[in-house]
């Protein structure tokens, strides 16, 4: 996506970069490096390619491989440890990967954050009642990776209640 293109574009400008591979890449990244047809979550294929091409650094753009532990994968294998991976370990990536985890972390560490309540299909009535205790605008966030689209900001209570029901009905997939 756009983030990966921006990273590749900037990295390609470094005089220290001899060759730049982007996996899987997109139409925009072809102008700055070589796209490689490997899914960002196929750690075995990425590591095999990195070893074959003598790659010194892996910069991870999308959240999905971070949450699934690509950093940990490289760090836990002796043959890959010498390859620098730019990105957090899996537990650190959970701050982005799970809104519930992030809110819990902030609460445990006294980091200021807005009031929240985690809602499931089973607790929808609790969620609707919680919305009534808040003031507009109402912010609803899906828990999980939604490619940057899992947040709704709604001006009225009626809209917030309607959208909460739709979110729990699968609006953002499994998130």
Predicted segments, located by residue:
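A glycine- and small-aliphatic-rich helix-loop capping segment at beta-alpha/alpha-beta transitions
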Residues: 73-84, 105, 155-162
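A conserved helix-loop-beta module that forms one wall/lid of the active-site cleft
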Residues: 80-150
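Short acidic-hydrophobic, aromatic-tinged amphipathic segments that line or gate anion-handling sites
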Residues: 35-42, 117-123, 152-154
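ATP-binding N-terminal substructure of ATP-dependent carboxylate-amine bond-forming enzymes
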Residues: 1-88
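Fold-independent oxyanion-binding glycine-rich loops
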Residues: 1-2, 23-26, 61-63, 88-89, ...
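Conserved ATP-binding module of the ATP-grasp superfamily
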Residues: 112-115, 133-139, 155-175
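A general structural signal for well-ordered alpha-helical segments in protein cores
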Residues: 43-46, 67-71, 99-103, 127, ...
């Amino acid at each position: 996506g756009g983030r990966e293109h921006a990273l590749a574009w900037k990295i390609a400008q470094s005089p220290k970069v001899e060759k730049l591979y982007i996996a899987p890449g997109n139409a925009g990244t072809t102008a700055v490096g070589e796209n490689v047809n490997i899914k960002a979550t196929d750690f075995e294929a990425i590591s095999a390619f990195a070893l074959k091409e003598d790659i010194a650094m892996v910069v991870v753009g999308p959240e999905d491989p971070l949450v699934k532990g690509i950093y940990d994968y490289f760090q836990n294998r002796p043959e890959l440890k010498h390859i620098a991976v730019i990105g957090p370990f899996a537990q650190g990536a959970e701050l982005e990967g799970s809104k519930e985890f992030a809110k819990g972390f902030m609460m445990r560490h006294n980091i200021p954050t807005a009031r929240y309540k985690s809602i499931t299909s089973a607790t929808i009535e609790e969620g609707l009642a919680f919305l009534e205790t808040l003031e507009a605008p109402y912010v609803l966030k899906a828990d999980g990776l939604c490619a940057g689209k899992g947040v709704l900001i709604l001006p009225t209570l009626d809209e917030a209640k309607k959208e909460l029901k739709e979110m729990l009905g699968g609006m953002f997939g499994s998130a």
